Amino acid sequence: MLNYVIKRLLGLIPTLFIVSVLVFLFVHMLPGDPARLIAGPEADAQVIELVRQQLGLDQPLYHQFWHYISNAVQGDFGLSMVSRRPVADEIASRFMPTLWLTITSMVWAVIFGMAAGIIAAVWRNRWPDRLSMTIAVSGISFPAFALGMFLIQVFSVELGWLPTVGADSWQHYILPSLTLGAAVAAVMARFTRASFVDVLSEDYMRTARAKGVSETWVVLKHGLRNAMIPVVTMMGLQFGFLLGGSIVVEKVFNWPGLGRLLVDSVEMRDYPVIQAEILLFSLEFILINLVVDVLYAAINPAIRYK
């Protein structure tokens, strides 16, 4: 297992290098001139050229890439073109709000989604199954921005129960986490149901029932563990999507996180921040997949990696 983990970690190097090249080319293909955006609409050509020189944008593209990649290897992602602060500081100040929002969304989505999926599988083709799957389909179908606006209108504007923007208290997390986790809960419910339906028809489940084991214990002990392997895969992927895909929700709720920082950086063509954030999201996905693979062996000891 240790050798497998080390090999996977070493595989990060070429993967991140390829991502770095693609991201660098992508951001430089974006329309618009960051020097003009930063200088302002009233700036003349001389001022814009001066800003371009200060940002290093007057250098050849290959020179800019070499400067970027050589510094990135040392953990230096440069300065933000907009704030002139270190990119690492910009990301660090936004990381924790996004992480806590992701964890909050994931916790309630997994609990609700797995419970709904198990109930739907145990009472298959009956009203609990139909109700759970109807709610799940609704959760998948409803766009995040529309759900967020609806929740703000009802619980913040009309009822005045919850705040709309900010991340200062636990109350600020309720509406964004509900919005962000709704689709994940729906996917988890459908995936758990499909996995449990397969497990419930296995011979060891019938054997446990024949031995007089209670249905609750059969479902929780024998069914849950064996149905968890594909579900864990989905949990890992969904966590990665939540962590890197909260852009719409953060924009709707004016959340001070990485998603909003990325949107603002794209609008202002802040190349260093865009490159660093996408690299961070890529690293997160790779590490999450590695953790999922390790969890496989913990859930099912029959799985071994070489």
Swiss-Prot record:
GO terms for biological process: transmembrane transport. Residues 95-292 form the ABC transmembrane type-1 domain. It is found in: Cell inner membrane. Keywords: Cell inner membrane, Cell membrane, Membrane, Transmembrane, Transmembrane helix, Transport. The chain crosses the membrane at residues 9-29, 103-123, 135-155, 169-189, 229-249, 278-298. GO terms for cellular component: plasma membrane. Its main location: membrane. Gene3D superfamilies: MetI-like. Pfam families: BPD_transp_1, BPD_transp_1_N. It is a multi-pass membrane protein. Residues 30-102, 156-168, 250-277 are periplasmic. Residues 1-8, 124-134, 190-228, 299-306 are cytoplasmic. PANTHER family: DIPEPTIDE TRANSPORT SYSTEM PERMEASE PROTEIN DPPB-RELATED, GLUTATHIONE TRANSPORT SYSTEM PERMEASE PROTEIN GSIC. Part of the ABC transporter complex GsiABCD involved in glutathione import. Probably responsible for the translocation of the substrate across the membrane. Belongs to the binding-protein-dependent transport system permease family. The complex is composed of two ATP-binding proteins (GsiA), two transmembrane proteins (GsiC and GsiD) and a solute-binding protein (GsiB). This is Glutathione transport system permease protein GsiC. It comes from Shigella flexneri serotype 5b (strain 8401). The lineage of its organism: Bacteria, Pseudomonadati, Pseudomonadota, Gammaproteobacteria, Enterobacterales.
